[in-house]
């Protein structure tokens, strides 16, 4: 229970330091707040630094009906909230051979990293190179479609990671969230024809941050901006 003790202590200190207690809000209210995010808010969120750890061990527990996974590497302690299918993907207690993709929620300077989802199983074998290179198409307004390869290095990859990396790239290389360029979507097409879509006008839904897909079976990725 060491991880849980650390988590509670960190959370208590954070509340004392900021004087803020975060309460639950209903999903309808949360979605409304997300949809109201401005270009600058989205640009800020998808430009935040990320913390990535591979082949680590985490501790999963439930506290007051909520599911968490704790990971400590060196002096970096992270508490990850599991809100979607990931809460059933990992067992209570110790989970080894996992990868975590951490993007801090909020802008506090607390020592603990508070993140949502982004936990996946580590690769079953070690790869020398990338495991998959699906076609990446970038479509911006009425401009010609740009095509490239997108390099996948994980067998099990979270929508959170794909969403972040694709938007970060679009921000830096194609002007997403600048000069009114906020609408559009990301479409990830699998080998069997099924698709996963992400709305660029809002942050990825919290419940989907824990979803993961088979990186070896991604056939094509389309990023449409307008």
From Swiss-Prot:
Gene3D superfamilies (UniProt xref): 2.40.50.110, 3.10.20.120
GO molecular function, one term: peptidase activity
InterPro entries, per the entry: Enterotoxin, SSL_OB, Staph_exotoxin, SuperAg_toxin_C, Superantigen_bac, Toxin_b-grasp_Staph/Strep
EC number: 3.4.21.-
Keyword Cytoplasm: no
Location in or out of the cell: Secreted
Main location: secreted
GO biological process: proteolysis
Coiled-coil blocks: none
Annotated transmembrane regions: none
Signal peptide limits: 1-30
Statement: the UniProt record of this protein carries the keyword Hydrolase: yes
Broad enzyme group: hydrolase
Biological role stated in the UniProt entry: Mediates virulence by proteolytically cleaving host proteins, including collagens types I and IV as well as human cytokines IL8, IL17A, and IFN-gamma.
Family: Belongs to the staphylococcal/streptococcal toxin family.
Matches recorded under NCBIfam families: PRK13037.1
Subunit structure, interactors included: Homodimer.
Record protein name field: Staphylococcal superantigen-like 1
Species name: Staphylococcus aureus (strain NCTC 8325 / PS 47)
Lineage of producing organism: Bacteria, Bacillati, Bacillota, Bacilli, Bacillales
């Amino acid at each position: 229970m060491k991880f849980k003790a650390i988590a509670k202590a960190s959370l208590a200190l954070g509340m004392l330091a900021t004087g803020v207690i975060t309460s639950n809000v209903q999903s309808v209210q949360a979605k409304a707040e997300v949809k109201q995010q401005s270009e600058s808010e989205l640009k800020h969120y998808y430009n935040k630094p990320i913390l990535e750890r591979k082949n680590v061990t985490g501790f999963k527990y439930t506290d007051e009906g909520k599911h968490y996974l704790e990971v400590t590497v060196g002096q970096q302690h992270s508490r990850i909230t599991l809100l979607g299918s990931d809460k059933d993907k990992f067992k209570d207690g110790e989970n080894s051979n996992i990868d975590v993709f951490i993007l801090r929620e909020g802008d506090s300077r607390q020592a603990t990293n508070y993140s949502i989802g982004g936990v996946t199983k580590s690769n079953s074998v070690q790869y020398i190179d990338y495991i998959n290179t699906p076609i990446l198409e970038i479509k911006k307004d009425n401009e010609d479609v740009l095509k490239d390869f997108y390099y996948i290095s994980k067998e099990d990859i979270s929508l959170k990671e794909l969403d972040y990396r694709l938007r970060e790239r679009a921000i830096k290389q194609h002007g997403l969230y600048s000069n009114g360029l906020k609408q559009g979507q990301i479409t990830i097409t699998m080998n069997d024809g099924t698709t996963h879509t992400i709305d660029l006008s809002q942050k990825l839904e919290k419940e989907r941050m824990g979803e993961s897909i088979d990186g070896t079976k991604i056939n094509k990725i389309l990023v449409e901006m307008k």
